[in-house]
Design a protein with these regions (language model features):
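Left-handed beta-helix
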Residues: 1-119
């Protein structure tokens, strides 16, 4: 893929590619593609794509997720809430607690098979 990526104090599963991004203090399962994004203190399950310029901190994601470029989660509680509200509009048949959850400590969980678009 050509762009140098960094895996710092982290574990990357088989098939994981970090292209031009940085992953720090995190665990990435199989077939995670980090495309010029920053991930910190997170657990990312199988088959997740994280788009360019996205930033994650304290995120636990399930599998089969697509994160569009420029999504920022875990840095600003108000912005995190806006993403949750947006997801409710994108997936009207799902209950809010089936989409994204935010703990009082700021840990964000994302369920399987969703896309998160930049707002």
């Amino acid at each position: 893929y050509g762009n140098e990526g960094y895996l710092i104090r982290s574990i990357g599963g088989a098939g994981t590619i970090i292209s031009g991004g940085t992953v720090k203090n995190s665990v990435l399962f199989e077939n995670v593609f980090v495309d010029g994004a920053k991930i910190e203190e997170s657990i990312i399950m199988d088959n997740v794509y994280v788009g360019k310029g996205s930033e994650f901190r304290k995120v636990i994601s399930d599998k089969d997720i697509r994160i569009h470029p420029g999504v920022r989660l875990g840095y600003d509680p108000e912005l995190d809430k806006r993403y949750l509200e947006s997801m409710c509009r994108w997936y009207p048949k799902r209950m809010p607690n089936e989409l994204m959850q935010i703990s009082p400590e700021g840990i964000i969980t994302i369920p399987k098979e969703v896309e998160i678009k930049r707002i």
